[in-house]
């Protein structure tokens, strides 16, 4: 073992099973790395960052990849090529699970490229590789020299015979009436993703609090690991608008932006906000000829802070609605003549056309995943074209998959059993106009 001088192993119990972290044995050129072992599940997680900020951008370029290797389950990929190709739907959803809790903890103004890769190398059906990837990403970032205000902990929660269970086994998941993934720090919850069979709200809250107690233990364990093997954090240059520009733009534009944000109609509101931005840029063009990026950033911050303050302090939303007010709803069924079922759902300026197709049960989607081979009798696909927000077409593949999975998770618990209704069901939700209402696809799918 002399060749692995920095190799360290850390162990703890999570959900009654051994969680093992191995650091310093492989991937020595990555900024941060950990091999997570939980049961027989093994996930290698790396974190890498560029040395310099990415020029001419105003966002944080974080990329998260969850890579499934078929050898992890003792399988050879199907098809002619016999090689892993594009990520599966499960891999995309798992990447989003990892991304959501870690993204907010990077410092504001940090524009370096950061890539987190979780590679599933061995799979135990009883030990979730997604949870291993989430914990591993936290460890890799926390022990690296990349600036990050973690760590976070993550668990799954199920409920079997009325008892909450941390990281339920495959057998327990099959009889559980709740499937929840929770991630957080010691102080707060960062992310919740859940599906349940009509579980009351307070019982869901109990499950979140139950998960948080285990998360605190995981975070304390990771903090011990960081104290042992953590690298000093890089001294990085964080982008921040010049204070002089920030103050001047706020004094000039904040009252005007507030008035524009309160416009009830979305299209008119966007036009008014654009007018404020154009006016502000023209006003400061000669005063700060090189301050274009700073002005854009301050205008964005003004908008975000104004909307947040209106909601939290005054209890009103951008179109002057209160918390409990909803936009007018309009529905229509039987929109298309030759389809099996259609529902057009409209709420405010959101329009979603959901189209249902029935087929024999043999048409169910076969999923040959790394954990198990299953068939999906209900499929929900979500299309979000650029014209729905008045823009040129753009690629939103991951978002479409995520929103389709959200609607699918909401509808599956209330569908009839295969024995009572032996048909495959495919629903396609076409977003025709969008105004920030994600559940339009779910509502439209309930129409008939």
Predicted features, each with a name:
Residues 2-50, 58, 237-371:
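Extended amphipathic alpha-helical scaffolds
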Residues 18, 30-115, 120-122, 127, ...:
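Glycine-rich, flexible beta-strand/loop modules in the N-terminal catalytic cores of phosphate-handling
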Residues 145-264:
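Mobile "lid/hinge" segments at catalytic clefts and subdomain interfaces of large enzymes
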């Amino acid at each position: 073992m002399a060749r692995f001088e920095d190799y360290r192993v850390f162990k703890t119990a999570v959900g009654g099973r051994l969680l093992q972290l191995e650091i310093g044995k492989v991937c020595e050129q990555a900024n941060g790395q950990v091999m997570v072992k939980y049961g027989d599940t093994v996930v290698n997680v790396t974190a890498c960052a560029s040395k310099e900020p990415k020029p001419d951008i105003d966002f944080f370029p974080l990329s998260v990849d969850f890579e499934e290797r078929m050898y992890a389950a003792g399988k050879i990929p199907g098809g002619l090529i016999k090689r892993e190709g594009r990520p599966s739907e499960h891999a995309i959803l798992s990447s989003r699970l990892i991304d959501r809790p870690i993204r907010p903890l990077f410092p504001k103004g940090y524009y370096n490229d950061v890539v987190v890769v979780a590679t599933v190398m061995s799979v135990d059906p009883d030990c979730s590789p997604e949870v291993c990837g989430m914990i591993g990403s936290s460890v890799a970032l926390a022990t690296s020299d990349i600036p990050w205000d973690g760590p976070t902990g993550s668990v799954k929660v199920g409920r079997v015979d009325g008892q909450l269970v941390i990281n339920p086994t495959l057998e327990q998941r099959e009889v559980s009436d709740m499937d929840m993934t929770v991630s957080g720090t010691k102080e707060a919850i960062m992310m919740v993703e859940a599906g349940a069979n009509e579980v009351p709200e307070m019982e869901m809250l109990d499950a979140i609090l139950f998960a948080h107690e285990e998360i605190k233990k995981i975070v304390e364990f990771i903090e011990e690991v960081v104290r042992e093997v953590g690298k000093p954090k890089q001294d990085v240059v964080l982008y921040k608008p010049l204070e002089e520009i920030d103050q001047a733009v706020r004094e000039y534009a904040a009252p005007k932006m507030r008035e524009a944000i309160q416009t009830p109609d979305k299209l008119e509101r966007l036009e008014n906000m654009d007018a404020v931005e154009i006016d502000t840029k023209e006003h400061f063009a000669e005063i700060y000829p090189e301050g274009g990026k700073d002005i854009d950033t301050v205008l964005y911050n003004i908008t975000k802070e104004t909307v947040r303050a209106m909601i939290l302090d005054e209890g009103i939303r951008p179109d002057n609605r209160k918390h409990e007010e909803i936009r007018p709803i309009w529905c229509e069924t039987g929109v298309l003549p030759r389809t099996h079922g259609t529902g057009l759902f409209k709420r405010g300026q959101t329009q979603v056309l959901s189209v249902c197709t029935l087929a024999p049960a043999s048409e169910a989607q076969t999923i040959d995943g790394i954990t198990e081979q299953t068939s999906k009798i209900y499929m929900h696909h979500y299309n979000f074209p650029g014209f729905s927000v008045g823009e040129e077409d753009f690629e939103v593949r991951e978002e479409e998959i995520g929103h389709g999975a959200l609607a699918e998770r909401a509808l599956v618990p209330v569908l009839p059993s295969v024995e009572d209704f032996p048909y495959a069901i495919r629903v396609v939700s076409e977003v025709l106009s969008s105004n920030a209402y994600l559940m339009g696809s779910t509502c439209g799918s309930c129409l008939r």
